[in-house]
Amino acid sequence: MTQFKRADRVADLVKMEIADILLRRIRDPRVSRLTVTGVKVSDDLRTARIFFVEMGEDSCHPETLEGLQKAGGFIRKELGKRLKLRYVPDLIFKPDSSFAYGSRIDQLINEIHREEENDGSDT
């Protein structure tokens, strides 16, 4: 049987709730095109790192991060209402670079395939 840490279960709940809060409660246009990709909660449940990407963008705009930080207090308050935890974790927002990295890898693989096709057609 697989053992799950409580922090992992809380992280899943926090991810779901923050995604819902961003979708339904935040009206700031700077954060309207965000997707929450992951949440890491510390073992003591006091800190949560929220990873996000901007739809259609390879990198995060500074205005987006600023908008999230401004809305952080409101998001934390909403989490406190929705989750039954003794402590609501402090929220740290971080852009998720894994999508940009994956996009770059995909681009390199496509370039290699194009070069192989060009080399094969020359002979």
Swiss-Prot record:
List, alphabetically, the SUPFAM superfamilies matched: Ribosome-binding factor A, RbfA (SSF89919)
Q: What is its main location?
A: cytoplasm
GO molecular-function annotation terms? ribosomal small subunit binding
Cellular compartments per GO CC:
cytosol
Q: Subcellular localization, per the record?
A: Cytoplasm
Q: What are the protein's UniProt keywords? A: Cytoplasm, Ribosome biogenesis
What is its quaternary makeup? Monomer. Binds 30S ribosomal subunits, but not 50S ribosomal subunits or 70S ribosomes.
* Chain's role: One of several proteins that assist in the late maturation steps of the functional core of the 30S ribosomal subunit. Associates with free 30S ribosomal subunits (but not with 30S subunits that are part of 70S ribosomes or polysomes). Required for efficient processing of 16S rRNA. May interact with the 5'-terminal helix region of 16S rRNA.
Name of the protein: Ribosome-binding factor A
Q: Which organism is it from?
A: Syntrophus aciditrophicus (strain SB)
Encoding gene per record: rbfA
